[in-house]
Structure formats: C-alpha cells, structure tokens
Amino acid sequence: MSAETATNPPVDTTPGAAPESATNGSNANVAADTTAGEASQTTSSTTPTAQPHSASLYVGELDPSVTEAMLFELFSSIGQVASIRVCRDAVTRRSLGYAYVNYNNTADGERALEDLNYTLIKGRPCRIMWSQRDPALRKTGQGNVFIKNLDTAIDNKALHDTFAAFGNILSCKVAQDEFGNSKGYGFVHYETAEAAQNAIKHVNGMLLNDKKVFVGHHIAKKDRQSKFEEMKANFTNVYVKNIDQDTTEEEFRDLFEKFGEITSATLARDAESGKSRGFGFVNFTSHDNAAAAVEALNDKDFKGQKLYVGRAQKKHEREEELRKQYEAARIEKASKYQGVNLYIKNLSDDIDDEKLRELFSSYGTITSAKVMRDFAPESTSDSEKEAKKDSKEPETKEEEPKDEAGDNAENKDNKENKAESKKSEKKPLGKSKGFGFVCFSSPDEASKAVTEMNQRMVHGKPLYVALAQRKDVRRSQLEASIQARNTIRQQQAAAAAGMPQPFMQPAVFYGPGQQNFIPNQRGGMPFQQPGMVIPGMPGGRHGQFGGFPGQQGGRGMNPNQQIPPNAYGIGAQGLPMGMQGAGIPNGLNYPQMGQVQAPFGRGRGQAPSGQGMPPNVQGMGPGGQYGRGMPVQQGMGRPGQAGRGQGAPAQAVGQRDENASPNGLTLQVLNAAPPAQQKQMLGEAIYPKIQAQQPELAGKITGMLLEMDNAELLALVDDDAALKAKVDEALTVYDEYVKNKGGDSGEPAADANKSKDASQETAEETKS
C-alpha cells in the first residue's frame, strides 16, 4: 500500500497539520490522519443506502496493542461478525492503528456505527465509519468541512455532537499530535454538500468554548499550494528584526510610511516587562509598496543596528525552508565525503588517533583520523582535588629592573612556554569504543586502504575496514537483509515441510515391522520421521556414544553391523547410497538409548564383538566393501568370519576413552568427522542441557552457541556452570535484538542462526 498523503488545513497552520486531513487533499471521505499503508482503506464515503450490500466498517484511532480478539468481543455484541482484521506493518508486524470489521448484514453495521462510535478501547476512543474501497468516491471533496481555532477540550465526540444537527456525518476527526493533544483544528465530512453548506452558514464565526471558530469548505492541498504561491508573489506583510530596544512605535511607523500607505505597524513586546523584543511587522495596502520597503531598508543601519526586512512568513513555511536548508547541507556533506571516509572497527584499546593515522598514512593523504571514545569522567574525589591544589604553587613576582627589549623577549618566551604547557596537559581520554574513522583526500586512496587493511591483524585483532555509511542507510540495509533472510527461511521451511528439525527430537531408530521401515526391503534400514517415538521404548539422550548404545543383535547378524542411533552418514531418505537392499539381516530390535549396556547379546552364529563403531559412521557410499556400501571399520569382523558357535567374550561397550565427555564425545572422535557434521554432533550433545534451562528458546540458543569454536563447545559439554553462563549470555543478546527490532521470541527454532546474526549486526550498528 502506498502512504496516504493527507492535505493540510489553510495556509495559516503549521506543517504538523498536514497529515490530519483528507487523502491527497481531495478525499471526500476521510477527515482523519492516517499512517502509511492506510491510503486506500481509511475512509468511509458511502452509507448503506448507497451500497446496501456493504457491511464493512473502518475502525480507527486504535491503540497499537489492540488485537482482533478485543475487537471481536466488542463488535460481536451488536451482531454476528464475519471477519475482523487489524492492519499491520508488513515488516515489523506492528499495528497501524486501524482495523476492518465485517458483518454478515448491513443492519448490524448500522447499529455498530451508531452505538459503538467513540467507544473507549484501551483508554482511547475509537472512530468508526463505513469502509469505501472505491478511490473515485473517496477523492471527491464534496461535503468535507474544515474547522480551525478549536478549544483543546473539544474531542471527536464533542465535535460530532456539535455538527450532527446539520446532516448525516460520515466522518469526524480532531487533529492530534503524537501525545494525543488537540492541534486546534479538525474535519467533519457530511453525506451531502447541502449539509456541509448549512453547517458553514450557521457555525462559522460562532463561539465554541469561548473561542471564535472558523468553518469553511475543505480545500485540496494542491489547490492551497497554488493559492499560497500566488500569495507569496503578492505579499503585503513585512517582517522586521534587529530593531533597537529603545525604538518607539512612532519611530518604527515613520520609518516605513515614506514607502506607502500602511494599514498596521507594531512591535512585539514582552508580556511582563513591556520591553521590545527586537522585531515587528508592517502591513502595506499594496504589494508594490511592501516590495519597495524591503528593497530599500533590508541591511540598512538604524540606530546602530543593521535591520533585516523581508516578507513575513508563516511558521510552517519557515520550518519547511529550514528543513530544506538542513537537508541540502546534509546531502552536500555526504557527497563531499562519499567514497573517501572509512569505517574501522575491532580496534585494540591501546590504539589512539595518532596510531590510527600511522596505520593508514602509507595509503595516501589523510585529512582526519579519529578513534571514538567514551566520555572521560571528571575527577571529583577530595583527594584528587587536594592534589590539584597542592600542585598549584603560588607564583612569586621578582622585582628586577629590566629593559623594554628584555621585557618583550621574556613575555614572548612566557607565552610560548604557556602554549607548550597547554599542549602537554591533554585532557584525560575515555575508554576506546573499538572503532573509528579515517578520511582520505581521494576515493582511490580510500579504496586502496580498504583492500590492503581489511582483515589485517593489528595488535592481535583482525581489522574490519569498509566505506563509512550513514546510520539510516545502514539501518535500512540491515532491515532489508533481515527481511530477505526471513523470506528465504520461510520458503525453505515450506519446502522442507515434514522434514525433521535439528535439535527438536531425539534421533530414534525403530524396530522391524514399524511403519517407518521402507516396504519391500529385506532387513531395510529404518528412516526417521519427525516427532515419532515408539510407545514404551525408553528415551535416550543425544550423543551417548561410548562405542555405541547396546543393541541386541538378531540371528546371524554381526553386532558390529548394527547401526548406532546417530549415523551421520545416512542420507535424507534414511539410507546411504548403496545400502538399499544391502542384505542387512532383519534383526534390528528396539535400541536401548537410556543406558549403555555391557556386552552385546549375541544370537547363533554371531562373531565376537570388536571395538565399537564411532558415532559418526563415515564413508557410507558406493566405495565401501562391506555390505555393498558399508565400510569395514577397525575391529569389525568380515562377514565370512562369523560362524556358528563363535562365542569369544565381547568387549564391554561401557568402556570408553578416559578423556571422553559423559556423552562419549571426544576431541579425536570429533576431528574424525567432517566439519559439517561436527556441529551436528556438538549440537546434539548440548541441546538437552540447554532445553532443560530454556525449553522454548533451546533451538535458538543452541544455534547461537554453535558459532563458537569446537574445542570450547566440547568443554561446555562437561561444564554445566560454564554452559549456563553461555546460555544466559546468549539469552541476553537475543532479548536485546528482540527489543531493538520488535521481533517475536516465539519464532520457529530453525531461525536460531538468523537471530544470532541479526543480534550481532544490530550490536555492531549500534556501536557506530
């Protein structure tokens, strides 16, 4: 939706009035200000008699926290509600302050409009009118009335009650500022032009709360703008400043009367003291006389002061000109430093402005180099003050005869010494913020510095060097990148619907005959389905390796042939390449994941069990020799060596490396796995512990912690106190990100990495 550019009241109002009137200055249906996205939907321009089939109401002036449920509770008391929608921002999902309520029949809509208009919802009166989607009907100016000079006590309901006697009102609105205070003007939109004319005739010039109000037809913004330009070209009112305070009214008038007939001349005075404030206004009868006075008296000395004489301007006009001047200066400054100003972060604390300049001086001429620092606190302790007093010794003056030349030379030396002492007495610097800026004289030098210095190690820290950007530009780019990532993640989530999510449920293998076995496959490898757990089977924890959990082998099956619960080489469909129909005997029973059993149970013809397979079964693919795709692991007997009656004692699976973690995960096992699977193994090891602390955000926090080094993560598996500290730190970062971006902590767990990236980017942007 496009933003609704509302019209301003007549020219004597401030720019803040602009958004409060009808759409594009010609909306016939809205007398209210609207936010972006409300353009095509804010106003109501028809009655049920015009469109009897329409039962859609617009509800405006809503508190941002109002939800569909609150509105349903209110509007369902009138009749059956078909639907309710609170309009929200597409990116932030924050309420735009208005909603639509659709009834099943028009009669209920009429009653709701009559009974619920200006009802308090969360302390704010709502404004209800008929919704009109046709822009042609909305943009007619017929029946729209503008009222100004309203008392601040008059609200929407009071204005509606005042003007309801002259006809059917479609919309009524008193303009308010961001704090909810009246701006002193409002709009009333009648159903017919006759009702609007009748209201203007009877109310214009009358007193409302002891204030004389102006009531007139609403003029479109484009029409007012053209009229305003005409008024500027034919001005008669002159503004004069830098007037001497002793100047009287007669002297001020005599100064301008020689240029033509004057209707009024006045000096602004203080209300309490009555003294002149140094400026005044002169109004001529003709534009030519006013222009002649401006031409002759501007920059002329009057009582020792140079006068400023120019066309009198409205407040909003002056503010608009100042805004344009500021914007022009900002653009000029930005273009001046475009491509030459560098942003450097990750600076060491001992790098100051001089060292920063030295680092980059070899790449070109530096116009400025600055390390950003905190403000240094002033020393206020009594001991420091006394030390300062003691250090200041009283100066003694020696009375010795000196010639003039000697005096001049000594004075010069004293001045130089004082200047040097001032330079040497530097103000204490605050702590470095870790980033700074370097400005070069040309873009080529800056580009060379970025190429050479980015990621260079300085004092043990890699520098980040890039072209500096304005804060608003960085924020918009950050929001765009976050929105793009959200879109991609939503698309990926939709495409991967039904696939198991990481760290959300234990990796469980199922016994034969269960529905998750591939049909028509003899002894088929099981594939996992998300969230499915066999009833009665003891649940296990991720990462309990120690060889691998004890699984009771079936008849004729080598125990080492059995697959551990976490077989990372298994493909998306549950089977590695070459394993379909591999002839694995139909002997996979339910895994005992809760505890590590001692020796494997063996059936007839089972070979003695050797050293357990590592948790990460690598190399499952066509290149394997065992089982047509299954590689032969160390300590694993070949198929032909397993005979009947072989009953050598099995090695206890519970035995593991002394340096292994309680989960059986060692640094050697971790390094033996591919890099992509190392994070998966670590994640499955720490996820249950994080889930015990933060059940709702366990996925997010796990993803954030997986950004750490593998060795640090492995240490966290055994150190619950350190893990809890890291979890609290990650939770603090995530909460800060949610506060800054208005996010929702209830997002899917798959977005954990996105939360980490966004929080880091937000922290970096906040620093700069």
Swiss-Prot record:
Cell compartment(s), UniProt: Cytoplasm; Nucleus
Low complexity bias: start-end ranges: 39-52
Biased composition regions of type Polar residues, renumbered to the chain: 1-11
Keywords from the UniProt entry: Cytoplasm, mRNA processing, mRNA transport, Nucleus, Repeat, RNA-binding, Translation regulation, Transport
Domain of life: Eukaryota
GO biological process, one term: regulation of translation
All copies of domain RRM, residue ranges: 55-133, 143-220, 236-314, 340-470
Region (Disordered): 1-52, 374-428, 633-662, 739-768
GO molecular function: RNA binding
GO cellular component: cytoplasm; nucleus
This protein's record includes keyword Cytoplasm: yes
InterPro entries: Nucleotide-bd_a/b_plait_sf, PABP-dom, PABP_1234, PABP_HYD_C, PABP_RRM1, RBD_domain_sf, RRM2_I_PABPs, RRM_dom
Compositional bias annotation for Gly residues: 637-646
Principal location: cytoplasm
Keyword presence, Zinc-finger: no
Domain PABC: 662-739
Coiled coil: none
Annotated Basic and acidic residues bias: 753-768
Function: Binds the poly(A) tail of mRNA. Appears to be an important mediator of the multiple roles of the poly(A) tail in mRNA biogenesis, stability and translation. In the nucleus, involved in both mRNA cleavage and polyadenylation. Is also required for efficient mRNA export to the cytoplasm. Acts in concert with a poly(A)-specific nuclease (PAN) to affect poly(A) tail shortening, which may occur concomitantly with either nucleocytoplasmic mRNA transport or translational initiation.
Family per similarity comment: Belongs to the polyadenylate-binding protein type-1 family.
Protein known as: Polyadenylate-binding protein, cytoplasmic and nuclear
Protein source organism: Coccidioides immitis (strain RS) (Valley fever fungus)
